[in-house]
C-alpha cells in the first residue's frame, strides 16, 4: 500500500513530461524551419545581386524568386 502513492506520482510525471520521440520531432521541425529560412535568405541575397542597379525592379525580383523556387 505504501507504493501506491509513489506509483501514482511516477504515472503523473511520465504523463506530463514529453517523451523522447516528441522532443526529437520538435527539434527536427525547428531544424527544417531554420533550413528553409536560411535558404530563403540565400535566394534573396542572390536575387538582389542579380537584379542590382537599374535592373532592380519588383518584376525582376519576383522572376528571380520564382526561378529559384521561392516565389509567392
From Swiss-Prot:
Changing residue 48 to A: Moderate decrease in inhibitory potency towards Kv1.1/KCNA1. Residues 24-43 form a propeptide. Changing residue 56 to A: Moderate decrease in inhibitory potency towards Kv1.1/KCNA1. Disulfide bonds join 47-64, 51-60. Transmembrane segments: none annotated. The record marks 48-49, 53, 55-56, 63 as: Important residue for potassium channel Kv1.1/KCNA1 inhibition. One of its GO terms (molecular function) is toxin activity. It comes from the Eukaryota. Keywords: Acetylcholine receptor inhibiting toxin, Amidation, Cleavage on pair of basic residues, Disulfide bond, Ion channel impairing toxin, Neurotoxin, Postsynaptic neurotoxin, Potassium channel impairing toxin, Secreted, Signal, Toxin, Voltage-gated potassium channel impairing toxin. The modification Histidine amide is found at residue 70. Changing residue 58 to A: Important decrease in inhibitory potency towards Kv1.1/KCNA1. Its main location: secreted. The record marks 58-59 as: Key residue for potassium channel Kv1.1/KCNA1 inhibition. GO terms for cellular component: extracellular region; host cell postsynaptic membrane. It is found in: Secreted. Expressed by the venom gland. Residues 1-23 form the signal peptide. Negative results: does not block or very poorly blocks Kv1.2/KCNA2, Kv1.3/KCNA3 (20%), Kv1.4/KCNA4 (13%), Kv1.5/KCNA5, Kv1.8/KCNA10, Kv2.1/KCNB1, Kv3.1/KCNC1, Kv4.2/KCND2, KCa2.3/KCNN3, KCa3.1/KCNN4. May not inhibit neuronal human alpha-7 nAChR, since it does not inhibit alpha-7 alpha-bungarotoxin binding (IC(50)=64 uM). Weak blocker of potassium channels Kv1.1/KCNA1 (IC(50)=578.5 nM-9.9 uM) and Kv1.6/KCNA6 (~60% block at 30 uM of toxin). Acts by binding to the pore and occluding it. Has a voltage-dependent mode of action, which can be explained by a high content of basic residues causing repulsions at higher membrane voltages. Shows a weak interaction with muscle-type nicotinic acetylcholine receptors (nAChR), since it inhibits alpha-bungarotoxin binding to muscle-type nAChR from T.californica (IC(50)=1.4 uM). This suggests it probably weakly inhibits muscle nAChR. Belongs to the short scorpion toxin superfamily. Potassium channel inhibitor kappa-KTx family. Kappa-KTx 5 subfamily. Has the structural arrangement of two alpha-helices stabilized by disulfide bonds (CSalpha/alpha 2(S-S)). This is Potassium channel toxin kappa-KTx 5.1.
Amino acid at each position: 500500500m505504501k507504493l501506491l502513492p509513489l506509483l501514482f506520482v511516477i504515472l503523473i510525471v511520465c504523463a506530463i513530461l514529453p517523451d523522447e520521440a516528441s522532443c526529437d520531432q520538435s527539434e527536427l521541425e525547428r531544424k527544417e524551419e531554420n533550413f528553409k529560412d536560411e535558404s530563403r535568405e540565400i535566394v534573396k541575397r542572390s536575387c538582389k545581386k542579380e537584379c542590382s542597379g537599374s535592373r532592380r525592379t519588383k518584376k525582376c525580383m519576383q522572376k528571380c524568386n520564382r526561378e529559384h523556387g521561392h516565389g509567392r
